[in-house]
């Protein structure tokens, strides 16, 4: 089976990058910016909330090891899909959750997973399902942020608890 790309926005990309690196079948995770109208945005520009971009990750994965539906179920567990412009302490349109589908098949699978999971939440799912257009990798200092700064307060109090929750809930999907 050929590799696939998933582009997902689930709040702070430091969190989502660290979360997806835990999974079997994930070959690469790149933090960056997706969905906006400003070409080659900087972090500072995206933080203004005026570029239309969301903090996102591009996940290159082997669907023979990690089916896209399982990747999405995991994604829904590591972000709050009922919150439109907020993920934990992070507020603004750049933290708005979205699935950027790369094919009609990805769109179909995402719609099915969203229907499957919707009854589990007390509020409607706010995560948007959007066609992929462009992705701009984030600046180098954002890459592997959690791995390089595990003692930073944001990493200890926001990312680490999220990863621990994911490890407990998705043991079968994790790398050995």
From Swiss-Prot:
InterPro entries: Met_Sox_Rdtase_MsrA_dom, Met_Sox_Rdtase_MsrA_sf
Top EC class of this enzyme: oxidoreductase
Origin superkingdom: Bacteria
GO MF assignments: L-methionine:thioredoxin-disulfide S-oxidoreductase activity; peptide-methionine (S)-S-oxide reductase activity
Enzyme Commission number, as recorded: 1.8.4.11
Catalytic activity as recorded in UniProt: L-methionyl-[protein] + [thioredoxin]-disulfide + H2O = L-methionyl-(S)-S-oxide-[protein] + [thioredoxin]-dithiol; [thioredoxin]-disulfide + L-methionine + H2O = L-methionine (S)-S-oxide + [thioredoxin]-dithiol
Keywords (A to Z) from UniProt: Oxidoreductase, Plasmid
Alphabetized SUPFAM superfamilies for the sequence: Peptide methionine sulfoxide reductase (SSF55068)
Catalytic residues of the enzyme: 12
Gene Ontology biological-process entries: protein modification process
UniProt-listed Pfam families: PMSR
PANTHER family the UniProt entry points to: PEPTIDE METHIONINE SULFOXIDE REDUCTASE (PTHR43774), PEPTIDE METHIONINE SULFOXIDE REDUCTASE MSRA 2 (PTHR43774:SF1)
Biological function: Has an important function as a repair enzyme for proteins that have been inactivated by oxidation. Catalyzes the reversible oxidation-reduction of methionine sulfoxide in proteins to methionine.
Family: Belongs to the MsrA Met sulfoxide reductase family.
NCBIfam families in UniProt: msrA
Protein name, entry field: Peptide methionine sulfoxide reductase MsrA
Native source organism of the sequence: Thermus thermophilus (strain ATCC 27634 / DSM 579 / HB8)
Organism taxonomic ancestry: Bacteria, Thermotogati, Deinococcota, Deinococci, Thermales
